[in-house]
A protein has these predicted regions:
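N-terminal export and membrane-targeting signals
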Residues: 1-22
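C-terminal region of N-terminal signal peptides and the immediate post-cleavage residues
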Residues: 24-60, 132
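Beta-lactamase-like hydrolase cores
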Residues: 43-108, 178-187
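Mid-domain, small-residue-enriched loop/turn segments at the edges of structured enzyme/sensor domains
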Residues: 86, 145-223, 230, 261-264, ...
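Active-site SXXK
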Residues: 97, 111-129, 225, 252-253, ...
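Small-residue-rich helix-loop
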Residues: 100-102, 308-461
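Short, well-structured active-site flanking segments
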Residues: 126-140, 261-267, 371-376
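A small/polar active-site loop signature that marks catalytic segments
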Residues: 221, 227-374
Length: 461
């Protein structure tokens, strides 16, 4: 008999429902965009109408398990694509944990953003899903520093400087305007704003990061308080980032309080005065969703520090990495071969094995760590959401995977990776991880084709 979690888990059922619904949407979209001339419409009128009936479809208890031989045969052609470069991978039956295929799956490779699956998994194991980060404004010593208030960073990187009613990039973001309103209501006459950036320790830029990525919009220095994750254009995904995000947050508060932003500076020590204002971030589960769907590097680094704090480690790059890998390892997830310097996967010094990644996804799909199960729902949907919204939409195997495959992507120069879950043609749920280093110019298409085979293949023999 199957474990009860497999048949009745709310998260698994919801995930399957979403996958089926997206598959229907993709199919309908394909029909609607296949041609709009009159002759096509007239021809279609004579054909039987297709029925689109999305529904919650439970995973079959009796679906056949793919064989290793069948899997190897099905993957032979896509694995041979030279654009995959140096490829490692692993495929596992989600229900039993049986390894079905592997290629050098214990070889450490540069994982890129699939590293975020570890950060998300450890966060789900460690933190409350409703956990929020609090940013405060505290009065400095009014005897020695009259009129000075201190913006105290609580680790939230996505405070919004947008005025009330204006959309922000991050759903549910706390607002500088709310802090300013509360400070005004306190009755203090503000003359200057300082910033307490002391929550995080160590460097704010990880080894193996390229400073050019600040201007390319991929990252900013990781500081204890930030506005819009350091974006200089708050509602643009690829906006260049700031090199001084904490001071920018202080300047935004100063401007909202009609104080000269040019006078903003760092506080010399944490303030001990009266708290004047506070705001809270979105809940952890929403922040994880944003991190995974958009592959948000800044969000990943700050969530890693939350895990570090909860496990008694320094809120630094090293502390976060130790906390994330340590929590997973102590929970039974194999971290052998993992060597990381950040929580986002942006560093070229990061190394993970395909087995590490597949074990994380497998733990989310398996019976032993139910706290990790929401990870499946956080993964982008092929052809439907996040970083997979424009992938798996061309080519036979890739198109058939749209709506059925969910995976975290990874992409750096000549690096492509995928780690996720898919239901095969026989109704069997498989987990997988592929890492391609030294990839060719069509490496991303090649790794998508490889993953796409898992959907079309029953692989029973």
């Amino acid at each position: 008999m199957s474990p009860p979690w497999w048949r009745r888990s709310t998260h698994v059922v919801l995930a399957v429902a979403v996958i089926v619904l997206v598959a229907v949407v993709v199919a309908v979209a394909a029909v609607m965009t296949s041609g709009g001339d009159t002759s096509s419409a007239q021809g279609a009128a004579g054909r039987p109408r297709a029925s689109a009936s999305p529904a919650v479809v439970p995973v079959s208890d009796s679906a056949p398990v793919p064989t290793a031989a069948g899997m190897t045969a099905a993957l032979a052609a896509p694995v041979a694509d030279p654009n995959l470069g140096n490829l490692t991978g692993r495929i596992t039956d989600a229900k039993t944990g049986t390894q079905l295929w592997e290629q050098r799956s214990t070889l450490p490779m540069l994982p890129a953003s699939t590293n975020k699956t570890l950060t998300a998994g450890a966060a789900l194991l460690t933190l409350d899903r409703d956990a929020r980060l609090t940013t405060t404004v505290v009065a400095a010593d009014q005897n020695s520093q009259p009129g000075v208030v201190v913006l105290v960073g609580g680790g939230d990187p996505v405070l919004s400087a947008a005025p009330p009613g204006q959309e922000t990039w991050y759903r549910g973001a706390a607002r500088i305007s709310d802090l300013a309103d509360q400070v005004r209501q306190s009755g203090i006459t503000v003359t200057r704003v300082q910033v307490d950036n002391s929550l995080f320790s160590g460097p704010d830029f990880a080894p193996g990061w390229d400073p050019a990525d600040i201007f390319g919009g991929d990252i900013a220095p990781i500081q204890a308080v930030m506005v819009d994750a350091g974006r200089t254009q708050p509602t643009t995904d690829e906006s260049r980032r700031s090199t001084t995000p904490a001071l920018d947050a202080g300047r935004a508060l100063a401007a909202a309080l009609r104080v000269d932003p040019a006078t903003v500076s760092f506080a010399s020590s944490p303030p001990t005065g009266q708290q004047l204002a506070s705001v809270q971030s979105a809940p952890l589960i929403e922040r994880l969703r944003q991190m995974m769907l958009a592959s948000d590097n800044v969000m990943a680094e700050t969530i890693g520090r939350e895990v570090a704090k909860a496990t008694g480690r320094p809120q630094s790059f090293a502390g976060a990495v130790d906390a994330v890998t340590g929590k997973l390892a102590s929970s039974g997830v194999d971290m052998t071969g993992a060597s990381l310097v950040d929580s986002s996967g942006l560093s070229v010094l990061d190394r993970l094995t395909a087995k590490n990644l597949d074990e994380v996804v497998g733990a989310a799909a398996g019976p032993n760590l139910p706290a990790m199960r929401p990870l499946l729902d956080l993964l982008p949907i092929a052809g439907g959401s996040g970083t997979l919204s424009d992938r798996f939409l061309a080519g036979d195997a890739r198109t058939s995977s749209a709506g059925w495959l969910r995976a975290k992507t990874g992409s750096l120069t000549a690096i492509n990776s995928l780690a996720g879950v898919v239901t095969d043609a026989s109704g069997r749920v498989l987990t997988f991880a592929f890492i391609s280093n030294d990839a060719g110019p069509t490496g991303r298409l090649a790794i998508d084709a490889l993953a796409g085979v898992l959907r079309t293949c029953g692989c029973g023999g």
